[in-house]
Amino acid sequence: MLTYLRREWQSFGETVTIKNTFNAQEDNNQSGRKTDNRPVKTEGRYCYKADVNRSKYYHDVQGFSLGQSDLHIDPTQFIMYSGTISNGISYVNQAPSCVQLSLKFTPGNSSLIEDLHIEPYKVEVLKIEHVGNVSRATLLSDIVSLSIAQKKLLLYGFTQLGIQGLTGDVVSVETKRIPTPTQTNLLTIEDSMQCFTWDMNCANVRSTKQDSRLIIYEQEDGFWKIVTETLSIKVKPYFKAYGTMGGAFKNWLVDSGFEKYQHDLAYVRDGVTVNAHTITYVNPSGKAGLQQDWRPATDYNGQITVLQPGDGFSVWYYEDKWQINQAIYAKNFQSDTRAQGYLENVGTLKFKMNYIPAFAEIRNKPGKVNYAYLNGGFAQVDASGYTGMSIILNFVCTGERFYASDNNSRVDNKITPFISYIGDYYTLSGGDFYRQGCCAGFAAGYDDVSPEHGITVSYTVMKPSDPDFITGGENYGESITSDLEVSIRNLQDQINSIIAEMNIQQVTSAVFTAITNLGELPGLFSNITKVFSKTKEALSKLKSRKKTSPMPIAATSIIDKTTVDVPNLTIVNKMPEEYELGIIYNSMRTKKLIEQKKHDFSTFTVATEVKLPYISKATNFSDQFMTSISSRGITIGKSDIIQYDPMNNILSAMNRKNAQIINYKIDPDLAHEVLSQMSTNATRSLFSLNVRKQLHINNSFDTPTYGQLVERILDDGQLLDILGKLNPNSVEELFSEFLHRIQHQLREY
């Protein structure tokens, strides 16, 4: 079966034909249109019998400036800043005209400017003028008078150099235009710094209409139309956590993370309702808490996933009122945004232990993380109700990473608000030291969080000049990849349950089942290659989401696209690989399925992913290669048997003098060279060099000489003979290597 499946899958390919059932009614309606509305192609262009209506575009734009000025854009557009303040930030990019600005400042507990403490306040700036050598600001405030720190924070932000001398906790500002003042305390402040100047009154009043959408370039040529557009959008990332409690009594947190989540929103832009959608992809790498497999199944165990500084998340945005609809190409994405904020865990922990409510709570510490906009671009999105072009906005989590690798990290009040933990109190008794496993960041286990940002973007798209051409958009039906996402999630849950429930007794039982029942594998069935391929694809997607250490070569997997049947040039009487695959598969198959004599093909497919050691005679290595690795400090010249184990990139050699096995940790590049040397004359086997040696030394009736030991180790017939005579209870410790190998593979997903 194994050889058949391997060769069939390596040559497997298919063409999927999707029948469009979503728009059948609409297609019938389209066919009934009058031909009068159809365009007529004339000399390479589409012409209409009726007059073509052209939209009127406004040019009174609010707040956007490209990095490189476009000839179609006024490079002196006025921009206001809202967000977290840092040194160098200005609230406006130039002197405004005829405006009244409202600024609301929210400092932290220990925010300082030039070593002066800042209190929260709100002002409405009416005008700033130069009087002699000073700048004088006329404003209204929610307090009777401003402190020196509040004055400096306000006026520095209206200079070309921006804020200076800001230290301590984060300070945020919300800046916006207001039609009429609302505060009552009229104040006048002065300083020698050179500020932007303006007056709220204007002699020539411009139109008050401020459009947030502008077509700045349009060209139509034959089949295609090229459009450049500037657009203000509202973006709402959505962070939705998930998790799985596993283990014998469902008290262990075996998986957690953030879903790829589609969020729908509607907002008004220029008096028109915009139906927008965001899809949020989160890439967390942190873990809080401790993984302690020795804990009893009645106790809590497990780590919670944490989005920590240095990690990122992406927001895919699309809507129904922009030029990207029906576009097939896009370029020149630009944005002036400085969007930033923080994600903070709110609400109670979602996960519970399997006890009555009074005892089901898990001790935890919610955390948070700051983030900032990084860059943006375009992508093709295949989402619920829409297939077409979207923009991607990438954000990065900022700040300094922190993880307590032991119990000796002293508590720091500056980072404590950011700390996440699960399973116990986050500090040791006394509260002076963080508990091992504390991690700074936003944990995946609390209520949904959805911050909001206003962002201005510009882009150029190419779309059909004939509107009858459809390239995607809301007319498309449900994503054809949604079923795959569901199967991936189910597969992830299944793998997590296997990790939590596997034990050495199950592995030992699988060894002896394989010997007596030729592996006990699922039988062949119709369509097996297609099902196998789909599951392999899901496993590949799962693995791509985790940061795993690089592998030197894929051929160490039992079945992979690059795997071939391994020649039996090293081990004589080689046991069928079905035996070894059966050990792995039945170690993962649930006890209930084994008792019912039922099979789980997903588990079988996962079993084929396990990477096995390669064993070879030392004489099979070239002299040149032996000299090469000796120069790297690896001495295997006086050995008879050499093994490479992909689990930890370990090269092992059995010493000729006393049969001692010497292990060398090697890097993936050298491992690739070793495997290249072994590929034509080695044997892949679940039974490693160490397991083979221990079986023959500890379970033989005689004490073999070194020569006899080498001969027996490389003979699977004698190995199976010994296994057939053993008591399962006496070799559990020896087979713990199998358990560790399987768990190591499963944790890659």
UniProtKB/Swiss-Prot annotation:
Taxonomy, top ranks, is: Viruses, Riboviria, Orthornavirae, Duplornaviricota, Resentoviricetes
InterPro entries with a match to the protein in the record: Rota_A_VP4, Rota_VP4_MID_sf
Give me the segments passing through the membrane: none
Q: What family does the database annotate?
A: Belongs to the rotavirus VP4 family.
Q: List the disulfide bonds.
A: none
Q: What is this protein called?
A: Outer capsid protein VP4
Per the record, the domain of life is Viruses
UniProt keyword annotations, A-Z: Capsid protein, Hemagglutinin, Host cell membrane, Host endoplasmic reticulum, Host membrane, Host-virus interaction, Membrane, Outer capsid protein, Viral attachment to host cell, Viral penetration into host cytoplasm, Viral penetration via permeabilization of host membrane, Virion, Virus entry into host cell
Q: Which GO terms describe its cellular component?
A: host cell endoplasmic reticulum-Golgi intermediate compartment; host cell plasma membrane; host cell rough endoplasmic reticulum; membrane; viral outer capsid
Q: Where is this site: Probable cleavage?
A: 206-207, 213-214
- GO terms for biological process, alphabetical: permeabilization of host organelle membrane involved in viral entry into host cell; virion attachment to host cell
